[in-house]
Curated annotation (Swiss-Prot):
It comes from Pelodictyon phaeoclathratiforme (strain DSM 5477 / BU-1). Its cofactor is Mg(2+). GO terms for cellular component: plasma membrane. One of its GO terms (molecular function) is metal ion binding. It is an enzyme of class 2 (transferase). Catalyzes the initial step of the lipid cycle reactions in the biosynthesis of the cell wall peptidoglycan: transfers peptidoglycan precursor phospho-MurNAc-pentapeptide from UDP-MurNAc-pentapeptide onto the lipid carrier undecaprenyl phosphate, yielding undecaprenyl-pyrophosphoryl-MurNAc-pentapeptide, known as lipid I. Its EC number is 2.7.8.13. It is a multi-pass membrane protein. The gene is mraY. This is Phospho-N-acetylmuramoyl-pentapeptide-transferase. The chain crosses the membrane at residues 30-50, 72-92, 95-115, 139-159, 169-189, 208-228, 238-258, 264-286, 345-365. Belongs to the glycosyltransferase 4 family. MraY subfamily. CDD domains: GT_MraY.
Length: 368
């Protein structure tokens, strides 16, 4: 909105200094600062309101240390989503299809998460929204993103082709499997972030690091010179994704002001599903979805721990008549909680791992 306003004024009067609005780095920085300030200023009043209505009960099977979170308001993801949407509307070329596809993903999965949180907190329905309806919501989003990027001419440059990390000339063409793969990636990543949201600051901090990395890739992919030099797909208009990415990063950082241990608020499924879908769609749009197991490695490990736990339990129960577990509790962060690690230590160590995964993903730009 500000972008179009200043551009209109500049076209009329050609005022000195207004050309800066055309620079991606300026608008990405402005979007980041705006998202941070909105979160910090709106946060206190928003938390006060949520405390009167939306207190999420802690699960009975949660670790003992988790029981003290029984009075925390949930649906904090609404604050993240609001900050992102406003800053992106102000500073991005929001009519760009890359931008509104990401915004659509955040809003849609935010609504799915809100319904889930509302059913748990207000209607007192144990488990919230059933897994079936969550899956329907995720598949619907995947169909929209997949079909739009498949059929819209503005995405026809690469269409169903993607690159393989660490290989200079190796590409994969999904062909008619493209749309099912888009559905799978959006579903998997949104669920992975949702599983990770179990400790104060863990999901928000990890998401900020991952999106910062993807934002860097977006900036490079949107510049023809950098893309050719680094041998990554050139995405016309893809640089706008960097503006959105920085808004997401700083909205998460602002949320950490209130969500760091001891948390005043938790994001709930409203935030975790929205952030997960944003990560997935950004990666898909810049053709770096095969990099997700590395750059979003912490989410991958959390999901893997749950999958292994369930599969091993079912196998041992079928084989020996009694189910056994690999971990004390899944997801992985709860395993370390039950081993006696302090919550802050787990979160910071997981952040460190996420930074290492981020740096390793940057190395793929040259290790080809």
């Amino acid at each position: 909105m500000i972008y179009y306003l200043l551009r209109y004024i500049n076209d009329l009067f050609d005022l000195p200094g207004l050309h800066v609005i055309e620079y991606l780095t300026f608008r990405a920085s402005a979007a980041a600062i705006t998202a941070l300030l909105i979160t910090l200023f709106v946060g206190p009043g928003f938390i006060k309101y949520l405390k009167t209505r939306f207190i999420e009960p802690v699960k009975e099977e949660a670790p003992p240390e988790h029981k003290k979170k029984n009075k925390l308001p949930t649906m904090g993801g609404l604050l993240i989503i609001f900050s992102i949407e406003i800053s992106v509307l102000l500073w991005s070329k929001f009519i760009d299809p890359h931008v509104w596809l990401i915004m659509l993903a955040i809003l849609w999965m935010g609504i799915i998460g809100f319904i889930d949180d509302y059913r748990k907190v207000v209607l007192k329905i144990k488990g919230g929204l059933s897994a079936r309806y969550k899956l329907i919501g995720q598949v619907t989003l995947g169909l929209v993103v997949g079909c739009y990027t498949w059929y819209d001419p503005s995405f026809s440059v690469l269409l169903s082709t993607t690159t393989v990390p660490f290989f200079k000339y190796l590409t994969i063409d999904y062909g008619y499997f493209y749309i099912p793969i888009v559905i799978f990636i959006i579903t998997a990543v949104s669920n992975a972030v949702n599983l990770t949201d179990g400790l104060d600051g863990l999901a928000a901090g990890s998401s900020a690091i991952v999106v910062m990395g993807l934002g860097g890739f977006s900036y490079l992919a949107g510049n023809a010179v950098y893309a050719v030099y680094l041998n990554i797909p050139f995405i016309p208009g893809g640089g706008e994704i960097a503006v959105v990415s920085m808004a997401i990063v700083m909205a998460c950082v602002g949320f950490l002001w209130f969500n760091s241990n001891p948390a005043e608020i938790i994001m709930g499924d409203t935030g975790s599903l929205a952030l997960g879908s944003a990560i997935a769609v950004i990666a898909l749009l810049i053709k770096q979805e095969l990099l997700l197991p590395l750059i979003a490695g912490i989410f991958f490990l959390e999901t893997l721990s749950v999958s292994l736990q369930v599969l091993y339990f079912k196998y041992t129960k079928m084989r020996y008549g009694q189910g056994k577990r690999i971990f004390l509790m899944a997801p992985l962060h709860h395993h370390f909680q039950l081993k006696g690690w302090a919550e802050q230590k787990i979160v910071i160590r997981f952040w460190i791992l996420t930074i290492l995964f981020f740096l390793a993903s940057l190395m793929t730009l040259k290790l080809r």
